[in-house]
Amino acid sequence: MTGNEAAAEAAIQAGCRFYYGYPITPQNEIINHMAMRMPQVGGTFIQAESEIAAINMLHGSAAAGARVMTSSSGPGISLKQEGISYLAGSELPCVIVNVQRGGPGLGDISPSQADYFQAVKGGGHGDYRMIVLAPSSVQEIADLVYDAFDLADKYRNPVMILGDAQLGQMMEPVEFYKPAKTYLPPKKWALTGADGRPKNVIKSFYPVKGELEKFNRRLQKKYRKIEETEVRYEEINTKDADLVLVAYGTCARISREVMNKASKIGYRIGLLRPITLWPFPKDALRRLSQRVRTFMVVEMSAGQMVEDVKLSILGRCPVHFYGRMGGGVPSTNEIINNILEVLPKINAADSVEMIEI
């Protein structure tokens, strides 16, 4: 199935029974799958009148204790930013899938990774964070969407799946090996209308002096706990590497092939693939920076994650960047030729020509 279909089905398997969305390419397969499957499992599917309406519908169902999801791409995610801030400010769990497309503006429907800043730094107002998960295969889309609902409930926080058009549209085998969740424990904080307990209040408005600062301090404490316990990454062939590629999503798939090809021409290349973009694997990068000669960050953007890599390694070694913008996807040859420009060939002549592999 496609990556988009895998995201939708994994959400259903994870117990999501409320989906609200609005059509936009390249994520429409998510909406189509939800429209078909939600009635079959007794869930609710609504194609909202707008992206803004969809994110606020999410707010209501999440407050009632349901597992909820929306999805969009590029301009649609931008429209949701105020609502995402409200969800974070109300500490409401939800899952948001962003199938990135080229920008800025209307852009195009090609794959991109230019929404990184918006996702990991917080595109809406206020000091809030989302957990951001970055799959690099259709199977991993399914796995991470399933996990995203557990993380959202665990921390009462929005979780974003940051994909791209290529991952969303590609087809690969998928196994839903985790048990479908047919029962979810009640959420003590939810607005259920139950009698016999203190009333629950869900809000993000704190007009009394000092209340908002106290709330923000509690949020930051929660975020620190997430940073301490939820970092995920994959590290490949870094033990003896002279250069380590850092890439996520589609670019990580390409970088893995670059690593394999480069080894055949005498280069010791490793790969660090962040799976959580927030919290970012800064400690892993910091450790690597003590023993590798240089890093190269590969992105489908003008360079966004590269800033977090530089902040992580504290100037211990050079950080190079290669990126394609506006829907461009880096090729293995392009990346290898950039490696040849920045790193002398191992066990061979220092001067090498550009090559085609």
Language-model features: locations:
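Redox- and metal-dependent alpha/beta enzyme cores, enriched for Fe-S-associated oxidoreductases
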Residues: 235-268, 272, 278-284
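Conformationally flexible catalytic loops at phosphate/diphosphate-handling active centers
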Residues: 27, 156-235
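Conserved thiamine diphosphate
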Residues: 110-160, 164, 352, 356-357
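Active-site nucleophile and cofactor-binding loops and adjacent substrate-binding regions
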Residues: 22-24, 44-56, 70-76, 98-101, ...
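N-terminal alpha/beta PP-like core and its mobile active-site loop of ThDP/TPP-dependent enzymes
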Residues: 60-69, 75-135, 184
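Peripheral docking tails and interdomain loops at the edges
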Residues: 299-357
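Glycine-/acidic-rich phosphate or pyrophosphate-binding loops and their flanking alpha/beta elements
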Residues: 2-6, 220-243, 256, 260
